[in-house]
């Protein structure tokens, strides 16, 4: 197996490129199936968030992944290759560990990425695109990333892009309590935004979602009025803050819609935060007076502030990554001995059972127990050592001192340096 991590993220690609390869939930099954149709790909999972799209797979031909990604999203291979990275083998494991631990996130140490990776893995398992090769790799990565976060402290007081969004609102509005917030979207990011805003004192929510049931759940938890996406034009003028985080493929809030809302508000300021990739709000909305529009890329400068403690924790986490990587390599190598160990143990167990049953029959027949046990012990030792003894004699005859040293190591013995004197 060759583990490969291939993709692009907020460090390598701007938002207008990332949104073109973002994986829509409705596309997930078909894309995974399409990926597994490639004869070069044995198993695969796809992770897609607002900041990254990554393919994790078992393949000996990683170059096909970029070609496939470009073809599926109708992009030029030459264009996409400028932003794409491919990590193989040990480097692929290291990259994935860094992603799962939050070290590669825009907000260093944010915990959501681990949950998102687990969801991508679980979905691939259900679909059957992750099987015996990738399953133990992912399970190791999940265990290791949890240890890294705990030991480094990088996961202490967890933050996320959603939390950064709330902090940005706090910089522009001094009083959370008086705000009317229009939340569009009911996914994980939207839920986190609602949670943090509610904790800061916001109680006036308008919540719209393509799935009305999901919006109702948020409204029940944090209070507020439940709306459909079609209600946005009517209720947009009531919002001081608009936070949109849907999975729509195209923008649905345009300049004219916001301009109309401003007129209804007598041009009172509006704060719009587009956390979606692809974007929900057209960029030219920012041309309007009294409108403050931000997207996920705009959060980067804010995220950099006040991160000293997390960066210190990240240094420790990087050291732990190297340690976990060494552990993984040793663990992965040990898998090669798994079948040998299993077969050897089964063989020894079978021999022991055969001799035990023979001894029990003799005892049942009235033979002296001490004599039977002595014979049982001798016969068992002879049978267990028969094949190794033949092998040791052969390698001694072949003058393979290296194999004899290995045998001494395996049998934990400090016997003579050679079983037989060299015949000159």
UniProtKB/Swiss-Prot annotation:
Catalyzes the NADPH-dependent reduction of glutamyl-tRNA(Glu) to glutamate 1-semialdehyde (GSA). Coiled coil: none annotated. Belongs to the glutamyl-tRNA reductase family. This is Glutamyl-tRNA reductase. Keywords: NADP, Oxidoreductase, Porphyrin biosynthesis. GO terms for molecular function: glutamyl-tRNA reductase activity; NADP binding. Gene3D superfamilies: Glutamyl-tRNA reductase, N-terminal domain, NAD(P)-binding Rossmann-like Domain. GO terms for biological process: protoporphyrinogen IX biosynthetic process from glutamate. The record marks 95 as: Important for activity. NADP(+) binds at residues 185-190. It is an enzyme of class 1 (oxidoreductase). During catalysis, the active site Cys acts as a nucleophile attacking the alpha-carbonyl group of tRNA-bound glutamate with the formation of a thioester intermediate between enzyme and glutamate, and the concomitant release of tRNA(Glu). The thioester intermediate is finally reduced by direct hydride transfer from NADPH, to form the product GSA.
